[in-house]
Structure formats: structure tokens, C-alpha cells
């Protein structure tokens, strides 16, 4: 019986002022983050580890000068094998980033 659950898989919030990042640096980070996440989700869907209910939400708040990215609505069909498959295909660093 597969282990099924749904929740937010990953989320990140960036505030440019405290980090001292310029808008260009934040945009470069956002692009890198999204490419990594899309790569992970394509792998999950192709290997039938995850259903296709995935959403990426990017929000910029002008009042606080901050970005937030949330990966929403996922269901892992077999969590026990997903970490091993992910780490073998994507590499340990990307899997650690996904879990954190």
C-alpha cells in the first residue's frame, strides 16, 4: 500500500532588504530555483512517484520588497522509494534542497 499524503512540498521567501540582495540577484536565484524544482517534478511525474497536482506560486510584495515562492498541492505515491530515486538521478544537493 503506497504511503500517500498531501501538503506543501517546498516554499521559500526572500526579502531583499535584510539580505542586501539587489533585484537582479534575486531574479537569478528565482530562475535557478524554479528550474531545479521543475526538473525534480518532471522526474517525479515520469517515474510515477507523484501525481500531476503541482502548482508553483510566485508572489512579489511591493510593500515589503519581498518575493515568495511556494510549490503547492502534491501527493507522493511511494515516499519510501522517492528519496533514493531522486538522489540517484538528481544528486544529493538538489534532494537536500527539496527536503529543506
UniProtKB/Swiss-Prot annotation:
Alphabetized, the UniProt keywords read: Membrane, Transmembrane, Transmembrane helix
Report the transmembrane regions from the record. 28-45
- Localization, UniProt: Membrane
Q: Which domain of life is it from?
A: Eukaryota
GO CC, one annotated term: membrane
Q: How does it sit in the membrane?
A: Single-pass membrane protein
Q: Does the keyword Transmembrane apply?
A: yes
Report what the protein is called.
Putative uncharacterized protein YDR340W
Q: Which organism is it from?
A: Saccharomyces cerevisiae (strain ATCC 204508 / S288c)
Amino acid at each position: 500500500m503506497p504511503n500517500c499524503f498531501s501538503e506543501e512540498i517546498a516554499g521559500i521567501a526572500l526579502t531583499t532588504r535584510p539580505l542586501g540582495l539587489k533585484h537582479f540577484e534575486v531574479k537569478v536565484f528565482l530562475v535557478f530555483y524554479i528550474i531545479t524544482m521543475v526538473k525534480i517534478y518532471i522526474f517525479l511525474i515520469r517515474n510515477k512517484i507523484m501525481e500531476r497536482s503541482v502548482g508553483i506560486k510566485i508572489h512579489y510584495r511591493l510593500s515589503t520588497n519581498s518575493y515568495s515562492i511556494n510549490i503547492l498541492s502534491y501527493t507522493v505515491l511511494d515516499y519510501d522509494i522517492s528519496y533514493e530515486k531522486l538522489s540517484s538521478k538528481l544528486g544529493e544537493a538538489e534532494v537536500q534542497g527539496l527536503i529543506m
